[in-house]
From Swiss-Prot:
Cytoplasm as UniProt keyword: yes
HAMAP family the UniProt entry points to: EF_P
Protein name: Elongation factor P
Pfam families from the UniProt entry: EFP, EFP_N, Elong-fact-P_C
Pathway, per record: Protein biosynthesis; polypeptide chain elongation
Gene transcribed to yield this protein: efp
SMART domains hit by this protein: EFP, Elong-fact-P_C
UniProt cross-references to CDD domains, sorted A to Z: S1_EF-P_repeat_1 (cd04470), S1_EF-P_repeat_2 (cd05794)
GO molecular function, one term: translation elongation factor activity
Localization, UniProt: Cytoplasm
Family stated for the protein in its record: Belongs to the elongation factor P family.
Species per Swiss-Prot/TrEMBL record: Synechococcus sp. (strain CC9605)
A single Gene Ontology CC term: cytoplasm
Any single biological process term in GO: peptide biosynthetic process
């Protein structure tokens, strides 16, 4: 159990059999009446965001999530197959369970799979990944002076904005949290 006074960004709680993550919270102490905690909660499984208010000190069940490091080994139909490299146990997740993370997921990548009551909820990618540019407009000599960007499609199908001087076949580092270009990757 966790008190509403102890909420922090990222805290996970259980409400009506579902896991919710605290996205924002604000402790409010009005001049008249009792204190309360106004929160913005995100459903871990579906991604829905709701605003909910709790009395100060209200006790709620804390959802104990388990993180396991798994490697994406291959695709089977629409399912993504992950393997625990220590036990060689396979876990299958659908495209819906992976959600937006699938645009950066490639075979051989190590990810954290977050589970609750032995049910996989979400895939946590590393903060940055190295991917190859598969499709982009060719760079024209002299384009670098303006510092502009152009769209590029990466090997996983993700689309990011990259500097004009990059071309097809180059490996770049991308921030998975905000889809931004971080730099070229050497090697």
């Amino acid at each position: 159990m966790i008190s509403s006074n102890d909420f922090r960004t990222g805290t996970t709680i259980e409400i009506d059999g579902a896991v919710w993550r605290v996205v924002e919270f604000l402790h409010v102490k009005p001049g008249k009446g009792s204190a309360f905690v106004r929160t913005k909660l995100k459903a871990v499984k579906s991604g829905n965001v709701v605003e909910k208010t709790f009395r100060a000190g209200e006790m709620l069940p804390q959802a104990m999530l388990e993180k396991s490091s798994l490697q994406h080994t291959y695709m089977e139909g629409e399912d993504y197959v992950f393997m625990d490299m220590a036990t060689y146990e396979e876990t299958r997740l659908s495209a819906d369970q992976i959600g937006e993370s699938r645009k950066y997921l490639k075979e051989g990548m190590e990810v954290n799979v977050v589970s609750w009551n032995d049910t996989p909820l979400e895939v946590e990618l590393p903060n940055s990944v190295v991917l190859e540019i598969k499709e982009t407009d060719p760079g024209v000599k002299g384009d670098t002076a303006t510092g502009g960007t152009k769209p590029a499609i990466l090997e996983t199908g993700a689309q990011v904005m990259v500097p004009l001087f990059l071309s097809v076949g180059e490996k770049i580092k991308v921030d998975t949290r905000n889809d931004s270009y971080l730099g070229r990757e050497n090697g």
